[in-house]
């Protein structure tokens, strides 16, 4: 085992070798190189060692090249530059001269120089290994001690220089410096440690808080509830809910409002049909189908609302309903009116009656050439503004009228009297709203009062002798009135709609004077009495079958006037407001069936003539 107990003697020998530029390396210096290969400690400065390493390198390469196979036998590799002994030797020597201190690979260099053939048999590989260890930049200072194992091998040595030793040195230096600082000023050292410990802790605590705040702004507010007071959480939740409500209500305020009201109205219609207990299976099925669509749409509209479970949302939706009640009517499609008229026609029982109804609709659809229907349309458009207020009262009166249809004949006069009383209680407000109607209808007052007196007497005469024919036609009248009632309950808002919808309904079902005369000529007295009993203000929904009664047609003009009688009696009570009272008397008729509007038109047209 090589020891450096005689380091002074080796230093003298090294200086003599460097000064004399000797070519042969003495034995003591060979032992020194073995020591460096074992420990990695150069002991001496690099300036005194440079010549020794240079001469040792040249001698080893020379002997290795002489003993190795010829250079011509060395194969050429595509990924490696061709080997040239002279150029590589000169480059290694130049690079070795550039070091100002011992390279950190000095231990590996010494190993290669001591025993060159231990790991390499070809000169090219050996010289490339030397090149790897010389083409470095890092250097080390002398005086470093290395640990040795029991068998003499260095534990810190590596194949291509000791890189781990460099790291260990840095750690030891830091530890030594820290120990020195602590020894010199223990109080200051402890304070510095406390500051170092406190700073990263504060940073670590601040960063998670910032991240937590970002996450909670996105949507997880419950985790923050323990830190904040209840009032702050409540205000924040309300603000976010208001923003969500604004976004949701701008998208579907009209849909929710339009869907919910028909659902409630259809529910009321089902309750009223249960009280009447009349068999109308086709109309009930259609009512259920129409009920299913808005109810399902209503559920779809309310599902996100329920999932959020927000009370403020419901309040805002209720306020939106109140604000947009006036706008709902204009938004509803006009096609529903035509569909419901077709539903009423499809519910008629007999095939002949349906055919006659189709003919009557064709006749009614032809507008009059003289333009006489324009005035009734204007009067209706002005009167429809107040129909919204009185719609619930009139639906209750219609229920009373339907319940009295199955009673005896004398009960037919009661609905007419109730309607006359209701129309008498309302004329003043309507006359104020409709000054134009008063100016238009001021001329034919005398003829209207005369027709009204005749119509009351004819109505009483027609109702008494026809009690027997009433029992036969209960089924037809009950079905027709029930279908009309469903149409009223499904679209009360539609009948009391804006003037644009009103004009569409009036244009689809106007009745010319000729059509009114034809329908009057086809009705026998008994059937007309029955229809007047069923609905005094409404003419027969369908022209009756002639086979039921074969009585002579003597009183058809008087019975035609009987259809006009409700409006005429109202005009008799209030002379100055005849047009408005007549229109209000026919409001229920307009809701019951499209034919009601037609009768109002024909009554006013006959009076004008």
From Swiss-Prot:
A GO molecular function term, named singly, is: protein phosphatase regulator activity
- Membrane spanning segments where? none
* UniProt KW Phosphoprotein keyword: yes
Looking up InterPro entries in the UniProt record yields: PPP4R2
Q: Where is the composition biased (Basic and acidic residues)?
A: 201-225, 233-244, 310-351, 375-400, 414-462
Assigned keywords, A-Z: Phosphoprotein
Q: Which domain of life is it from?
A: Eukaryota
Please list the residues that carry the modification Phosphoserine. 68, 223, 226, 252, 603
Positions bearing Phosphothreonine: 602
Q: Name one Pfam family in it.
A: PPP4R2
What's a GO biological-process term for it?
A: negative regulation of smoothened signaling pathway
Please provide, in alphabetical order, the Gene Ontology terms of the cellular component aspect for this entry.
chromosome, centromeric region; cytoplasm; nucleus; protein phosphatase 4 complex
Family matches, as PANTHER family: PPP4R2-RELATED PROTEIN, PROTEIN PHOSPHATASE 4 REGULATORY SUBUNIT 2-RELATED
Query: Record's family?
Result: Belongs to the PPP4R2 family.
Its name, as the record gives it, is Serine/threonine-protein phosphatase 4 regulatory subunit 2
Organism this protein belongs to: Drosophila melanogaster (Fruit fly)
């Amino acid at each position: 085992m090589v020891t450096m107990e005689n380091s002074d003697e080796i230093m003298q020998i090294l200086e003599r070798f460097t000064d004399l530029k000797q070519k042969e390396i003495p034995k003591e210096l060979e032992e020194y190189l073995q020591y460096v290969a074992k420990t990695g400690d150069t002991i001496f400065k690099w300036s005194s060692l440079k010549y020794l390493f240079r001469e040792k390198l040249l001698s080893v390469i020379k002997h290795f090249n002489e003993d190795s196979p010829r250079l011509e036998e060395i194969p050429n590799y595509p990924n490696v530059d061709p080997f040239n002994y002279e150029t590589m030797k000169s480059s290694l020597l130049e690079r070795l001269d550039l070091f100002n201190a011992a390279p950190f690979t000095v231990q590996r260099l010494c190993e290669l120089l001591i025993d060159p053939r231990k790991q390499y048999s070809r000169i090219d590989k050996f010289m490339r290994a030397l090149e790897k260890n010389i083409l470095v930049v890092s250097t080390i200072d002398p005086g470093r001690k290395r640990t040795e194992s029991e068998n003499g091998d260095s534990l810190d040595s590596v194949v291509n220089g000791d890189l781990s030793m460099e790291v260990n040195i840095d750690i030891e230096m830091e530890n030594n410096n820290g120990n020195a600082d602590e020894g010199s000023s223990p109080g200051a050292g402890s304070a510095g440690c406390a500051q170092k410990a406190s700073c990263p802790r504060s940073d670590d605590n601040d960063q998670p808080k910032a991240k937590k705040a970002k996450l909670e702004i996105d949507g997880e507010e419950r985790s923050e509830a323990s830190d904040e007071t209840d009032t702050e959480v409540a205000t924040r939740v309300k603000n976010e809910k208001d923003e969500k409500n604004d976004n949701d209500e701008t998208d579907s305020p009209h849909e929710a409002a339009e869907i919910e009201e028909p659902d409630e109205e259809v529910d009321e219609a089902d309750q009223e049909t249960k009280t009447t207990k009349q068999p109308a299976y086709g109309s009930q099925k259609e009512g259920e189908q129409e009920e299913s669509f808005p109810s399902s749409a209503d559920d779809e509209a309310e599902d996100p609302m329920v999932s959020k479970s927000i009370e403020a949302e419901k309040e805002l939706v209720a306020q939106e309903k109140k604000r947009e009640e006036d706008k709902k009517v204009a938004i509803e499609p006009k096609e529903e009116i035509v569909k419901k008229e077709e539903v009423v026609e499809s519910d008629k029982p007999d095939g002949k009656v349906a055919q006659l109804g189709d003919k009557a609709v064709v006749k009614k659809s032809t507008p009059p050439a003289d333009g006489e229907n324009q005035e009734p349309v204007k009067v209706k458009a002005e009167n429809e503004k107040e129909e919204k207020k009185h719609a619930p009262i009139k639906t209750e009166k219609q229920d009373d009228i339907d319940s009295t249809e199955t009673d005896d004949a004398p009960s037919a006069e009661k609905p007419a009297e109730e309607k006359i009383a209701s129309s008498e209680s309302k004329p003043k407000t309507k006359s104020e709203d409709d000054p134009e109607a008063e100016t238009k209808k001021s001329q034919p007052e005398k003829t209207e009062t005369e027709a009204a007196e005749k119509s009351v007497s004819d109505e009483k005469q027609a109702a008494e002798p026809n009690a027997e024919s009433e029992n036969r036609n209960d089924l037809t009248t009950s079905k027709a009135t029930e279908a009309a009632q469903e149409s009223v309950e499904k679209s009360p808002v539609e009948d009391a709609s804006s003037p644009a919808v009103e004009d569409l309904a009036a244009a689809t079902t106007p009745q010319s004077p000729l059509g009114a005369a034809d329908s009057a000529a086809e009705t026998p007295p008994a059937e007309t009495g029955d229809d007047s009993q069923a609905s005094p203000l409404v003419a027969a929904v369908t022209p009756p079958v002639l086979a039921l009664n074969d009585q002579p047609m003597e009183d058809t003009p008087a019975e035609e006037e009987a259809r006009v009688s409700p409006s005429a009696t109202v005009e008799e009570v209030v002379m100055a407001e005849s047009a408005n009272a007549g229109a209000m008397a026919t409001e229920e008729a307009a809701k019951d069936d499209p034919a009601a509007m037609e009768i109002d038109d024909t009554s006013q047209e006959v009076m004008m003539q």
